[in-house]
Amino acid sequence: MKYNCDESIDRQGTQSAKYQMLPDGTPEGALSLWVADMDFRCAEPIIKALHDRVEHGIFGYSLYKLSEVKSTVVGWYKKRFDWDVEEKNVFFSPGIIPALSALIQLLSKEGDGIIIQPPVYFPFAGKIGVNRRVVANSPLIRVDGDYVMDYETLEEKFADPKNVGMILCSPHNPVGRVWSEDELRRLVEIAKKYDKWILSDEIHFDLVRKGVKHTPLLKICPEYADKVVVCTAPSKTFNLAGMQISNIVIHDPELQEKWLGLVDDCWGMMMPNAMGVTAMMAAYTQGEEWLDQVIAYIDENMKAACAYVKENLPKARMDYPEGTYLLWLDLSEYCGDPEKLAEIMLKKAKVVLDDGYIFGPEGNGFERINVACPRSILMDCLERIKTALVGA
């Protein structure tokens, strides 16, 4: 089936955070390219599966054949990444952020430090803080124009006895790096040296550019598996964030028991949402054709955006993202004041973006743009930014 990613779909009135949770003072007619979900209609097999479930008309307590659900998840891992995962090591959560919060509670105590790599997805720092832990920053650095891990600083952070572990973003949001096997192995060796854990948020794992390979962290360190947790979900991949289902891969039997004690017994989240399971099963068994077309479309959007920026915003700096559908645009040469830049984007350009400073001070002067939308909307957004910064 051929899917039409150029179709513009009105999402008003659908409880869409992207279109209804807008900043105060958002002008009429502003374009919304901030929240990381897609403006593409879901794969037809997913829609049909949900229709069939809804048509039944009864939505009582659900009991799943967990082996069937988990088999579908690990089958996807094997097919897309040649990653062998045992079903017994897969656990469910309404989302990766709730899972990270639970894991922080299980693996650390109040006052412990947890390493992150800014500029990075801001809920990492938020969940560390709300759980009364301490953020230990090891910022990414630029080498020959590319973002890379600062292994010297990472070693210092891991060596510090106050720091007990790390949250990794892989692929990295917002900078778009897809870490190579060598980069990941080097990171694991440092963690292993100091016997520290790593929580790897891999929610964007399916969304990489053509020719780029994502490596699940657990795949390359079986000997250290008890100290690594990998978090995945169908939500970014298949535009299912509202379905609230994520898959958490935990190897350590002791941590598995603690997880069940907290998430199942204490919080009562024993089973995933009925619609979430229905959507995920359809996605992982029948959604690949849709996904391949969407990835190809996003790749072309990225190319079009890069070409436009190079020609029309010569003082901007932008790396071609290896993964995600997020563009990390450095506009600091046009406006060095991050709050003023944010105001220009909202009030003058009339585009709602994720302002770089929310990802940490390393993001000052940047804007994060979601390109998972019809190309006409993306190009309109870039044209508005250009007009606001350099004139028509």
Give the positions of each predicted feature.
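Conserved core of the PLP fold type I
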Residues: 59-189, 206-207, 211-222, 229
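Helix C-cap/helix->beta junction micro-motif
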Residues: 131, 193-194, 224, 349
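Conserved core segment of the aminotransferase class I/II
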Residues: 222-299, 303, 307, 389-390
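N-terminal small-domain helix-loop-helix segment of the aminotransferase-like
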Residues: 2-95, 102, 283, 391-392
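PLP-dependent enzyme catalytic core of the Aspartate aminotransferase-like
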Residues: 344-353, 359-392
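Hydrophobic residues in well-ordered beta-strands that form the structural core
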Residues: 116, 137, 199-200, 353-355
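Conserved glycine-rich beta-strand-loop-beta hairpin in the small C-terminal domain of fold type I
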Residues: 281, 297-306, 318-331, 363
